[in-house]
């Protein structure tokens, strides 16, 4: 698992847990089968995917955005991913940091059925409830 975060503390926890620290988001995403993002706002998510991550994604990659963002941005990014032949879901979380630490997050997932089925096994490892809320 390759990871990138602006927080040195977060990256230290990744490395301590057996992951590898990447120098940038695109370095973490290049060659990955799964790309998971969790960013502060829709503008950050849009900039990350349109700026680098769509290009870095493998044709078979599953893109999972766990940010809590506006519906219009999530739909536009899903359409942009589909136009590139990529599977993408919008999967905001509920449960806070305690649930994240315990692996008991709840994911409310939006996206096409096929993309959801590709993302489901990954999300099930990260949380206790994975709910497909539609496409």
Give, region by region, the residue ranges found by the protein language model.
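Rossmann-fold dinucleotide-binding core
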Residues: 48, 68-135
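A short acidic, helix-capping loop that chelates divalent metal ions and anchors anionic groups
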Residues: 10-13, 45, 98-101
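The conserved SAM/SAH-binding core of class I Rossmann-like methyltransferase domains
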Residues: 4, 38, 91
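Residues in the short beta-alpha loop(s) of Rossmann-like NAD(P)-binding domains
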Residues: 6-7, 41, 112
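Conserved SAM-binding strand-loop segment of SAM-dependent methyltransferases
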Residues: 19-24
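Rossmann-fold NAD(P) dinucleotide-binding segment
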Residues: 25-87
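NAD(P)-binding Rossmann-fold cofactor-contacting core
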Residues: 1-17
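Conserved beta-strand edge residues that scaffold enzyme active sites
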Residues: 8-10, 28, 95
């Amino acid at each position: 698992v390759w990871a990138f975060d602006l927080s040195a503390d977060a990256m230290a926890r990744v490395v301590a847990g057996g992951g590898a620290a990447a120098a940038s988001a695109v370095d973490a995403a290049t060659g990955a089968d799964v790309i998971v993002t969790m960013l502060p706002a829709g503008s950050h998510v849009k900039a990350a995917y349109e700026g680098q991550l769509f290009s870095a994604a493998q044709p078979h990659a599953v893109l999972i955005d766990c940010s809590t963002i506006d519906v219009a941005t999530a739909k536009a990014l899903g359409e942009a991913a589909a136009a590139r032949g990529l599977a993408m879901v919008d999967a905001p979380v509920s449960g806070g940091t305690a649930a994240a630490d315990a692996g008991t997050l709840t994911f409310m997932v939006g996206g096409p059925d096929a993309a959801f089925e590709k993302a489901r096994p990954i999300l099930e490892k990260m949380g206790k409830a994975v709910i497909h809320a539609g496409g």
